């Protein structure tokens, strides 16, 4: 097996404007012992050709061309080929700060970590030149045991540090030994990370912020109506409950977190129904909202959660009243802000 330290895995599709910047942000890393797998997932633009051009000049870059199968399949192809001691997954329309790999590898080597977690940036563009940047920092911590990590995981979930792959460095041996792959599903990052977290023993959190997740709201998946979102969120909640059962963690903090996380997703489902791209009639929307907020799980978990902001407290009022009409009005307002005032929406979302 090659002695390369880090395998960078990046699915590529329809990103000809951005993929060069993503690749160069890895080439500009102060840490140089890496290989990159840029997986062209049957893209119809020039993204694959751009990757080929970079690979022709840098032997550390390997391009795989395949038929379109989605980002999960692209990542999985690279997982099978990667030789690195560590795996790093990034998106092809984002970029990383130059010291990211160096700092992550240093932490992993020093503490024999199976998983290194860091902070990140979300850059939300609301015009071609203006953006709102949310900085997600975190206090550094070396978990002394698996149990300590599990009992503290609610705090990391709360800070949105455990959902995505691009703020993490993974042990390659851990991925291989547990035969972990990205499932072929929408929001594949989340179940992949849950499978990693399920039995991970050695976790280190470092305080640096490195990765820039770029969100262009006009093109964002979050501005689209999804008819199955409520069912997906219900499924997600089941995954989280199963994880905590597997861990044997049932303390007050974790119960409150699971309840609040579920209710926050319920609010997101209401926003989805009131999205302007949703073609349901007014009465159909109200009926769907009623179905969502009258769920027995909502009534069970509402008393267990603690709203963390005035914004969230206000959002909960019509749901506690079980008023589909008022919840509809509230969701419509948020959806309008989401599509019409991106800066304000990004700010409000960060305060949930």
Language-model-derived ranges and their functions:
Residues 1-27:
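N-proximal low-complexity "stem/linker" segments adjacent to membrane-targeting elements
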Residues 26, 41-42, 55, 69-70, ...:
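Conserved short acidic donor-positioning loop in nucleotide-sugar-dependent glycosyltransferases
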Residues 32, 40-49, 67:
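A conserved acidic beta->alpha catalytic loop
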Residues 67-75, 79, 186:
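A short, glycine-/small-residue-rich helix N-cap motif at loop->alpha-helix starts
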Residues 71, 92-228:
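Donor-binding/catalytic cores of nucleotide-activated saccharide
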Residues 87:
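Short aromatic/hydrophobic "clamp" motif used to bind/position activated sugar donors
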Residues 113, 275-352:
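Membrane-interface aromatic/basic loop that binds lipid-linked glycans or pyrophosphate carriers
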Residues 208-217, 223-252, 268, 272, ...:
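Catalytic core of nucleotide-sugar-dependent glycosyltransferases
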């Amino acid at each position: 097996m090659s002695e390369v330290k880090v395998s960078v895995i990046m699915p590529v599709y329809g990103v000809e404007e951005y993929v060069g910047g993503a690749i160069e942000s890895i080439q500009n890393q102060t840490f140089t012992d890496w290989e990159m797998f840029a997986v062209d997932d049957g893209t119809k633009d020039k993204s694959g050709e751009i990757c080929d051009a970079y690979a022709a000049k840098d032997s550390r870059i390997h391009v795989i061309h395949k038929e379109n199968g989605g980002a999960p399949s692209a990542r999985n192809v690279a997982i099978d080929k990667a030789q690195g001691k560590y795996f790093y997954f990034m998106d092809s329309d984002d970029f990383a700060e130059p010291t990211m790999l160096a700092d992550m590898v240093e932490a992993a080597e020093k503490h024999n970590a199976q998983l290194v977690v860091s902070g990140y940036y979300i850059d939300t563009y609301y015009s071609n030149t203006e953006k709102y940047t949310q900085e997600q920092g975190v206090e550094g911590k070396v978990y002394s045991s698996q149990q300590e990590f599990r009992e503290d995981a609610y705090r990391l979930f709360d800070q949105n540090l455990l959902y995505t792959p691009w703020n993490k460095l993974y042990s390659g041996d851990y991925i291989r030994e547990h035969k972990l792959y990205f499932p072929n599903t929408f929001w594949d990052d989340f179940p992949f990370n849950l499978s990693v977290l399920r039995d991970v023993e050695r976790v280190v959190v470092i305080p640096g912020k490195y990765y820039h997740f770029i969100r262009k709201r006009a093109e964002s998946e979050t501005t689209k109506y999804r008819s199955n979102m409520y069912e997906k969120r219900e499924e997600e909640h089941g995954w989280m409950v199963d994880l905590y059962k597997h861990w044997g963690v049932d303390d007050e903090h974790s119960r409150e977190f699971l309840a609040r996380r579920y209710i926050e997703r319920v609010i997101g489902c209401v926003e989805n129904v009131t999205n302007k791209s949703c073609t349901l009639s007014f009465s159909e929307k109200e009926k769907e909202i009623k179905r969502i907020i009258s769920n027995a799980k909502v009534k069970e978990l509402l008393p267990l959660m603690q709203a963390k902001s005035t914004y969230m407290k206000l959002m909960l009022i019509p749901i506690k009243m079980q008023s589909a009409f008022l919840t509809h009005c509230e969701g419509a307002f948020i959806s309008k802000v989401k599509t019409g005032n991106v800066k304000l929406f990004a700010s409000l979302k960060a305060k949930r």
